């Protein structure tokens, strides 16, 4: 969103690194050219599953040799009982941060069939199938995970 890009721009204004912040619809064709690093924070989970392979291939193709993708996503557990427990933990966390049960319920309903999480294995397989030579999990907390993928 423009507001998120503005905050990112403010946070990076003194950075000596070269960067480009882009607002795009990932369900459409994404043009990435000559990138050293691509970061997707809680983004791919909103891309329709049938479009995720082409999104990953576009990212892979747009990275320079040795480039990397940092992917952080909401994930679902391979074990349904754990998945439900993790979701409940997350709702408790939101309540502790001041959200009401109604707000939590409304957000969950709004994201139903829009946010479609995959398992850690499904995400890893997606990255491997796109051509990344190295894929590793660098972060996992309940139903959230971070991956690093190297070209």
Predicted features and spans:
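Class I SAM-dependent methyltransferase SAM/SAH-binding core
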Residues: 1-29
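A conserved beta-strand element that flanks and buttresses the S-adenosyl-L-methionine
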Residues: 39
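A short glycine-rich, Lys/Arg-flanked "PGG" loop and its adjoining helix->strand segment in the class I
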Residues: 53-65
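Conserved beta-strand signature within the Rossmann-like core of class I S-adenosyl-L-methionine
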Residues: 66-74
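C-terminal alpha-helical "lid/dimerization" subdomain adjacent to the S-adenosyl-L-methionine
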Residues: 74-130
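Core SAM-dependent methyltransferase catalytic element
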Residues: 124-151
């Amino acid at each position: 969103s423009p507001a998120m890009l503005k905050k990112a721009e403010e946070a990076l204004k003194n950075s000596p690194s070269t960067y480009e912040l882009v607002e795009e619809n990932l369900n459409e064709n994404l043009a990435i050219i000559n990138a050293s690093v691509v970061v997707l924070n809680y983004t791919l989970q909103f891309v329709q599953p049938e479009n995720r392979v082409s999104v990953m291939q576009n990212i892979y193709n747009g990275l320079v040799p040795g480039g990397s993708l940092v992917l952080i996503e909401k994930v679902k557990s391979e074990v349904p009982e754990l998945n439900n427990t993790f979701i409940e933990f997350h709702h408790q966390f939101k309540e502790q941060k001041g959200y009401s049960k109604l707000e939590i319920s409304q957000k969950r309903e709004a994201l139903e069939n829009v946010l479609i999480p995959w398992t850690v294995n499904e995400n890893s397989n997606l990255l491997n199938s796109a051509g990344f030579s190295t894929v590793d999990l660098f972060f996992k907390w309940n139903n959230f995970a971070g991956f690093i993928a190297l070209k």
